[in-house]
């Protein structure tokens, strides 16, 4: 049992720094299963500190002018119709054909929040570019980049927050990694369950419901499981189609027209507001004409001390193409 009060001010910052560094190094490595945490599962000051640090994917505070909130409020009535249409279009779409001497290049760009001190944070852009070889025996390649912050928070104290960054930059891990089967972090990049997941929408709904755990609600857990798999850029068209139909059936699913991903592409946002997170709205963004998955967005629900309701606090863009070489 912990009886000592939590550290504050300078003492907190000193205790927080090594935890932040460790989690920053691990978070990108584990992005393929970003299970949402709740404070109900936290039982110590240390765990609360770790939790606050893990939420670097834009769940707490922050926004960026380069990812504007565009479009109408989510409308639940049309979500199922939009997703069914996207599923139909996806079935008509062929997966990229990668020759034996070529690579499937999948680029994931994101702006995510890194906490600098107990009070200050920064919105830090980074990217993960994966090269999957057409030759099954060849190594995969992962290229990681991290850039300087595009914003500091709170905005009213941006200069002080920037000084905290300058004192100890909290960028994401960078560099190039090569590994067989894309096992850059001990497990393959492509989720192992993709091959065995049912393609029948009813069977897939049951599968997702049985395997979804660890979020603020079961509905959120189901949404996160599907979103994480889609975010790898490795889900084949037939499974994407079934996943869209499953999303359409998750209670609370809504559609936001004219959503925007990080690289400026426009699509339809499909997601839900989580009541246990003050209405925070997380969504996948799809191209309604092709059924392609093009990114994700997270928007604030209730207004906070620094952010109005409906602010985009996290945005990703996922794109893929076939290339002739890897770095």
Language-model segments: which ranges?
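Intrinsically disordered, low-complexity prosegments and terminal tails associated
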Residues: 38, 49-327
């Amino acid at each position: 049992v912990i009886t000592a009060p939590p550290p504050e001010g300078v003492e907190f910052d000193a205790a927080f720094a090594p935890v932040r560094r460790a989690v920053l190094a691990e978070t990108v490595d584990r992005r393929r299963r970003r299970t949402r945490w709740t404070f109900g599962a936290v039982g110590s000051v240390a765990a609360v500190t770790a939790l606050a640090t893990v939420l670097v994917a834009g769940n707490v505070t922050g926004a960026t002018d380069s990812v504007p909130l565009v479009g109408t409020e989510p409308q639940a009535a049309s979500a199922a119709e939009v997703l069914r249409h996207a599923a139909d279009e996806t079935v008509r779409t062929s997966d990229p054909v990668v020759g034996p001497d070529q690579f499937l290049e999948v680029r994931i760009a994101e702006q995510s929040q890194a906490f600098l001190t107990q009070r200050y944070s920064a919105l830090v852009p980074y990217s993960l570019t994966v090269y999957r070889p057409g030759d099954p025996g060849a190594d995969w390649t992962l290229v990681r980049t991290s850039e300087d912050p595009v914003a500091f928070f709170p905005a009213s104290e941006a200069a002080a927050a920037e000084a905290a960054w300058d004192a100890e930059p909290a960028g994401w891990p960078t560099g190039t990694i090569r590994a067989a089967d894309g096992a850059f972090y001990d497990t393959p990049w492509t989720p192992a369950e993709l091959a065995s997941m049912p393609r029948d929408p009813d069977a897939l709904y049951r599968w997702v419901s049985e395997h979804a755990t660890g979020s603020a609600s079961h509905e959120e857990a189901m949404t996160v499981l599907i979103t994480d798999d889609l975010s790898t850029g490795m889900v084949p068209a037939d499974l994407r189609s079934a996943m869209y139909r499953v999303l359409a059936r998750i209670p609370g699913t809504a559609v936001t027209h004219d959503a925007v991903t990080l690289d400026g592409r426009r699509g339809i946002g499909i997601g839900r507001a989580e009541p246990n997170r003050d209405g925070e709205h997380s969504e996948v963004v799809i191209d309604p004409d092709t059924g392609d998955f093009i990114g994700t967005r997270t928007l604030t629900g209730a207004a906070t001390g620094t952010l109005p309701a409906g602010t985009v606090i996290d945005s990703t863009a996922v794109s893929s193409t076939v290339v002739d070489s890897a770095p």
